[in-house]
Amino acid sequence: MTNDTLGLYGPEDSRYLNLVAHRAEAKGIKTAWVDGPTPGCVAYVADTDAGWPMWDLTPEEDVDNIQHPGLSCCAAVVLLCMRYIYSLPRDRRVCIIGRGHAVQWMYRVMRCYSYEVDQCSSTALDMAYLVSRADIIVNSADAVTEEVLGAVPASATVIDISGSMEPLSDRVADYVPRDHVGRWNIAELLRRVRVRIEEEGETDG
């Protein structure tokens, strides 16, 4: 059996997984809704917000690094955005809000790139202070307070993974909305899946 299908794990009304399925179809990548390990699946993607328990994935199947160390697709595209699209200098101070899958390994990699980085949980009491001194804010918190929004410098670049800083869209120097990050995230996911399919094809050959 050829392993050339991306397994979708989560509620079938998941907006994220349905977007993945739609964009995968446009790129000629097969998808299937699954509830466990499935013959023919080369990789799996899950709606991590759904909180469904998962079986153990191999590193090869886990293209989004849900269970394994490494950059998630979202974290990878945010780094690409900072380095190449916006050409943000490395001497800028970055504040990462949240510690979940969306920003997985981002702190570690940014430190390797010589950024000054602060990271806090989405409920940190000192969040307003941390954002007030940041040049770049990467936000993955589901909600932020008015105090935090008010502390964001007008000169800042905000990369808004979750969308909870949307009120700042016309109040900061640069604002990257949730939809943009989401499109890049899915593009990176499908790129990784395509690599896995090609690797499987070489093995079968």
Where are these regions (language model features)?
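Rossmann-fold NAD(P) dinucleotide-binding segment
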Residues: A143-T157
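N-terminal Rossmann-like NAD(P) cofactor-binding module of classical short-chain dehydrogenase/reductase
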Residues: A43, I137-V138, I159
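Adenosine-phosphate binding glycine-rich loop
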Residues: T2, G10, A75, L80-R83, ...
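Non-catalytic beta/alpha edge segments that cap or flank active sites
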Residues: T2-G40, W52-D56, L190-I197
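Alpha-helix C-terminal capping/helix-to-coil transition sites in glycosyltransferase folds
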Residues: P39-G40, S132-R133, A154
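Glycine-rich phosphate/diphosphate-binding loop of Rossmann-like nucleotide-binding domains
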Residues: D4-R23, T31, G70-E147
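Phosphate/diphosphate ligand-binding glycine-rich loop within oxidoreductases
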Residues: D35-S72
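Short glycine-/small-residue-rich Rossmann-like dinucleotide-binding loops
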Residues: D47-T48, S140-A143, S162-G163
